[in-house]
């Protein structure tokens, strides 16, 4: 048996929500160890960036090339967090007038959908870097270990600890488990 890696919190999924969760916990006084376990090659999850192998410097933000914040309750913590990202040049307002889906251009003013309500933002760099930049906001970034290209295939809760097993046989133990990946809805997750 491979000796398990031991953490206070194990997070499955390396997208924006995982990075915000980790950063917020450290800011609120948490000082334990966190593992972010991601099936992809880097942070970002559905907000990631593809780099061309043939055209150096060419990037495509896909999945979620931008994001919007609908803060109808005027949540001060959310406002402060977004303002910090703006002040530190991590994000900027998305002033795009058009959205293109499946080759059809749609004017923003024509969209009547809750997913487009609120302020739209884009990463100043790439969407993959957005998650890493959010992690970099906290001074405890060294308390986070990353496991990329690591697919969790089994979860068990034994003696008040989560035991996670990856496809390659690595085991992770943690007091707490956060499942942030939208792949929880995927067919392969039903087997867990």
Task: Spell out what each predicted region is.
Residues 148-163:
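A conserved short coil-to-beta-strand element within the FAD-binding core of flavoproteins
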Residues 66-76, 107-137, 147:
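Short beta-strand to alpha-helix junction loop
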Residues 51-79:
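N-terminal glycine-rich dinucleotide-binding loop that anchors FAD/FMN and/or NAD(P) in oxidoreductases
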Residues 17, 42, 184:
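Conserved Rossmann-like nucleotide-cofactor binding loop
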Residues 9-12, 37, 152, 171-186:
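Short hydrophobic core segments
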Residues 10-12, 23-54:
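Glycine-rich FAD pyrophosphate-binding loop
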Residues 2-17, 35:
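Beta1/beta-strand and adjacent pyrophosphate-binding region of the FAD-binding site
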């Amino acid at each position: 048996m491979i000796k398990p890696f031991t953490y206070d919190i194990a997070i499955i999924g390396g997208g924006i929500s995982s990075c915000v969760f980790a950063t917020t916990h450290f800011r609120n006084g948490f000082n334990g160890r966190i593992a972010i376990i991601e099936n992809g090659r880097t942070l970002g999850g559905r907000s990631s960036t593809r780099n061309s192998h043939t055209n150096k410097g060419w990037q495509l933000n896909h999945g979620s090339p931008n994001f919007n914040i609908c803060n109808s309750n005027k949540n001060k913590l959310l406002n402060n967090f977004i303002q910090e990202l703006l002040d530190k040049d991590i994000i900027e307002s998305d002033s795009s007038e058009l959205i293109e889906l499946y080759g059809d251009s749609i004017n923003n003013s024509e969209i009547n959908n809750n997913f487009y309500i609120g302020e739209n933002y884009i990463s100043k760099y790439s969407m993959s870097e957005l998650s890493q930049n959010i992690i970099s906001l906290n001074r405890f970034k060294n308390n986070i270990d990353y496991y990329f290209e690591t697919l969790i295939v089994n979860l068990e809760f034994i003696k008040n600890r989560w035991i996670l097993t990856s496809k390659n046989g690595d085991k992770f133990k943690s007091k707490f488990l956060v499942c942030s990946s939208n792949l929880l809805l995927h067919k392969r997750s039903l087997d867990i």
